[in-house]
C-alpha cells in the first residue's frame, strides 16, 4: 500500500474491534479493538482492522502483485521438486476463471489478512518475513547435501553469500 501510494507512512486507523461494510461485519481478533493504530503498531499488535482498511484501499489485484513480489503464490524452488506446492494468492481474474464468479469486496478484506482463498507454505511465509526484516532484500534458501561429520551429529554447510553480514 505504501509502494502504491495508497497510504502514507503516517496513515492511521481507528480499530473498534470490527469493520462494517455493505451489511457485513469483519471482526478484529481483539474484540474491544486496538484504538488508533499506525502501520508499525498494526504489525506489532496484528490488528486485523488496519489491514482490512489497507486492503480495501489497495484492492485485491494490486495486493496480489505485491504478494507475488514476496514469493506468495509461487514455488520457492521453481520446478526443482514436483512435490512442492506453489500455494495460491487470488485475484479477480483467478476467481472468474476458476469459480466462474465475480470478486466481492469482502473477499479483499479477508485476503488482506491471509484468509479466504489464500494458500501459502511455511517456507513462503518464512522467506516473506525474512524479506520484510531485511528491508526488502530477498534471501533464498540454500539446499545442502547429506554431508555429516563422523559422529553424524552435525551437518556441515557453507553460509550462502546472500545472507546479511554482521557489522
Feature names for model-found ranges:
Residues 2-167:
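Beta-lactam-recognizing serine transpeptidase/beta-lactamase-like catalytic domain environment
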Amino acid at each position: 500500500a505504501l509502494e502504491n501510494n495508497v497510504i502514507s507512512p503516517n496513515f492511521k486507523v481507528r480499530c473498534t474491534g470490527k469493520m462494517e461494510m455493505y451489511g457485513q461485519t469483519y471482526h478484529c481478533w481483539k474484540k474491544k479493538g486496538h484504538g488508533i493504530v499506525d502501520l508499525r503498531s498494526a504489525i506489532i499488535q496484528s490488528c486485523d482492522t488496519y489491514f482490512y482498511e489497507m486492503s480495501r484501499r489497495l484492492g485485491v489485484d494490486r495486493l496480489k502483485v505485491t504478494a507475488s513480489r514476496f514469493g506468495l503464490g509461487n514455488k520457492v524452488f521453481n520446478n526443482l521438486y514436483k512435490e512442492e506446492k506453489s500455494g495460491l494468492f487470488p485475484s479477480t481474474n483467478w476467481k472468474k476463471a476458476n469459480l466462474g464468479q465475480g470478486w466481492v469486496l469482502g473477499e479483499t478484506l479477508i485476503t488482506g489478512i491471509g484468509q479466504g482463498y489464500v494458500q501459502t507454505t511455511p517456507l513462503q511465509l518464512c522467506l516473506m518475513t525474512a524479506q520484510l526484516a531485511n528491508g526488502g532484500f530477498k534471501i533464498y534458501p540454500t539446499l545442502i547435501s547429506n554431508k555429516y561429520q563422523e559422529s553424524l551429529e552435525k551437518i556441515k554447510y557453507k553460509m550462502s553469500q546472500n545472507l546479511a553480514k554482521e557489522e
